[in-house]
Amino acid sequence: MTKLENPVLMATIGGAQGLRGEVRAKAYTADPSALGDYGHLHSMDGRSFEVLEIRETKNVVIVRFRGVNDRNAAEALNGLELYIERDNLPDEELEDDEFYYADLEGLEARDDKGASYGTVTGVFDFGAGDLLELKGPGKRPVLIPFSEASVLEIDLEAGTLLIDPLAAGLVDDPEELSKFTADKPKKKK
């Protein structure tokens, strides 16, 4: 049983394919057929899966794992999410302006005046472009576009995103920015 310290979601199993124990899976990698190149995949309940074969189809990959030899065993994996340890992702292949979604989660979103708009709690792609989910203390989560106009700078070492709250849709009017500033004037008693 393996417990991952910094898990990164790589695929979700969708169901059995055929009679030999193969499964259909949605891969969350740039190259879906490279799913097995990252080493063993792990479930959150501690199981480990070694990819023996993988082939691409139109919307999913068909995967055969060691030890999953029949349809019943494959069906038992339906809906299972598979992860790898963050350290297994190849950082040297990233360009300066490329990031893994997993590295963005936990960053604090701030504007140029230092006001905080929350922490990145998720990164989503619903088809029209990537979105960042921000959650602040006592606030409901909000989604902002992950675009050059909204996210001006990413500093992984400092743990921050520099955002433009107007472009991100967090405020409708530039004058509203003053209510988010870090140094709010205190009310007189």
UniProtKB/Swiss-Prot annotation:
Subunit structure: Binds ribosomal protein uS19.
GO biological process: ribosomal small subunit biogenesis; rRNA processing
Classification via InterPro entries: PRC-brl_dom (IPR027275), PRC_barrel-like_sf (IPR011033), RimM (IPR011961), RimM_N (IPR002676), RimM_N_sf (IPR036976), Transl_B-barrel_sf (IPR009000)
HAMAP family, per database record: Ribosome_mat_RimM (MF_00014)
Presence of keyword rRNA processing: yes
Entry text on domains: The PRC barrel domain binds ribosomal protein uS19.
Family: Belongs to the RimM family.
UniProtKB keywords: Chaperone, Cytoplasm, Ribosome biogenesis, rRNA processing
This protein's name: Ribosome maturation factor RimM
Domain of life: Bacteria
Domain PRC barrel: 95-177
GO cellular component, one term: cytoplasm
Function: An accessory protein needed during the final step in the assembly of 30S ribosomal subunit, possibly for assembly of the head region. Essential for efficient processing of 16S rRNA. May be needed both before and after RbfA during the maturation of 16S rRNA. It has affinity for free ribosomal 30S subunits but not for 70S ribosomes.
Molecular function GO labels: ribosome binding
Compartments (UniProt record): Cytoplasm
